[in-house]
Curated annotation (Swiss-Prot):
UniProt EC number: 4.2.1.20
Entry protein name: Tryptophan synthase beta chain
Pfam families in alphabetical order: PALP
NCBIfam families: trpB (TIGR00263)
Pathways involved: Amino-acid biosynthesis; L-tryptophan biosynthesis; L-tryptophan from chorismate: step 5/5
Organism: Rhodopseudomonas palustris (strain TIE-1)
Length: 404
């Protein structure tokens, strides 16, 4: 914590993909040429105005951006403190923030001449976004999904199949997101010649954490413009949920060098931090998983522990390496919310705002319930409403015994 602070919190990663001691490229030798190819292709695409122009066109006409910045009037009134705004990523085509990143990666796959795309998915939102973009751009799509998640996210499984994707249930480990990612990496090693791996969060080997962050930064860039229009100044705080952390990184990154903006990331505390949870920063330590060094849930022998969250999208035993670094340098405050707190926030948002939030951003809303009442009425707080909750209704009904 006492390390010298950087001149900018936005300059990472270095050329080897490190954010301080985190990140990097811990991959099998067979994958190294692919990773280097991808890095080169991404650098070229980033420097190509035609790539950016095409992407902006699809974001506007296909995804439906910019997404609204909405003043949550009744929630603000209810808490009696900070003025709360929602960044409405739930209104994007496919229903979450995931599509911002997938559009960029699928355009890159097309540019690299890869006809086959693989992806891992937890809640199914990244899988749906990938299947959607593969259909739009005419690419083959295979999605790896833990068998447990296939059960609890049936609507999304059906959406992926309707869009022409093959969904492969993964029955190893805890049958959830970590295991789906393991399988996807195995498939990639086997099919290096024709396959593009579309990772759904700011994790994995470099350049993925940087690339996904760059594609998601459209969220925070829009918020800067929208809040200036609405309030004439920048927000005082930002709040977002964290699984791997791509929705949060998309909101946070454009504000990291604004010292007046407090930033809160909310992890999933599951049944409690002393029990089963998915809060890698609150309850983990640095280690290596899925190609990068970051905070992980590990036992005393360094074995990866199973994560638990009511939300399939936060149920991951790690976190993006840039978040790990931002925690260590003290720029982002990491909090956590339990399953029960998230369910309470879910119900409150439905009843007060007429918005059914996904269980993921319900974790962020749960901490808004703690933070907002203690803040003055002129405090501007922006919460990332990262996805809609249709996919979670069956699961929520089950937890609430059928009584909403």
């Amino acid at each position: 914590m006492n390390q010298a602070l950087p001149n900018s919190f936005r300059s990472g990663p270095d050329e080897r993909g490190h954010f301080g001691i985190y990140g990097g490229r811990f991959v099998a030798e067979t994958l190294m040429p692919l990773i280097l190819d991808l890095e080169k292709a991404y650098a070229e695409a980033k420097a190509d105005p035609a790539f950016r122009a095409e992407m902006d066109n699809h974001l506007k006409h296909y995804v439906g951006r910019p997404s609204a910045l909405y003043f949550a009037e009744r929630l603000t009134e209810h808490f009696g403190g900070a003025k709360i705004y929602f960044k409405r990523e739930d209104l994007n085509h496919t229903g979450a923030h995931k599509v911002n990143n997938v559009l960029g990666q699928i355009m890159l796959a097309k540019r690299m001449g890869k006809p086959r795309v693989i992806a891992e998915t937890g809640a199914g939102m990244h899988g749906v976004a990938t299947a959607t973009m593969c259909a739009k751009f005419g690419l083959e799509c295979v999605v790896f999904m833990g068998a447990v998640d296939v059960e609890r996210q049936q609507p999304n499984v059906l959406r992926m199949k309707a869009l022409g994707a093959e969904v492969r249930p993964v029955t190893s480990g805890a049958n959830t997101l970590k295991d789906a990612m393991n399988e996807a990496l195995r498939d990639w090693v086997t099919n290096v010649h024709d396959t593009f791996y579309c990772i759904g969060t700011v994790a994995g080997p470099h350049p993925y954490p940087m690339m996904v962050r760059d594609f998601q930064a459209v969220i925070g860039q829009e918020v800067r413009e929208q809040i200036m229009q609405a309030e004439g100044r920048l927000p005082d705080s930002l709040v977002a949920c964290i699984g791997g952390g791509s929705n949060a990184m998309g909101l946070f990154h454009p504000f990291l060098d604004d010292p007046g903006v407090a930033i809160y990331g909310v992890e999933a505390a599951g049944h409690g931090l002393d029990k089963l949870h998915a809060a890698s920063i609150a309850g983990g330590k640095p280690g290596v998983l899925h190609g990068n060094r970051t905070y992980l849930l590990m036992d005393a022998d360094g074995q990866i522990e199973e994560a638990h969250s009511i939300s399939a999208g936060l149920d991951y035993p790690g976190v993006g390496p840039e978040h790990s670094w931002l925690h260590d340098v003290g720029r982002v405050n990491f909090l956590s919310a339990t399953d029960t707190e998230a369910l309470d926030a879910f119900k409150l948002c439905c009843r007060l705002e007429g918005i059914i939030p996904a269980l993921e951003p319900s974790h962020a809303l749960a901490k808004v319930a703690d933070l907002a009442p203690k803040l003055p009425k002129d405090h501007l707080m922006v919460v990332n409403m990262s996805g809609r909750g249709d996919k979670d209704l069956a699961s929520v009904a089950e937890h609430l015994g059928g009584k909403f």
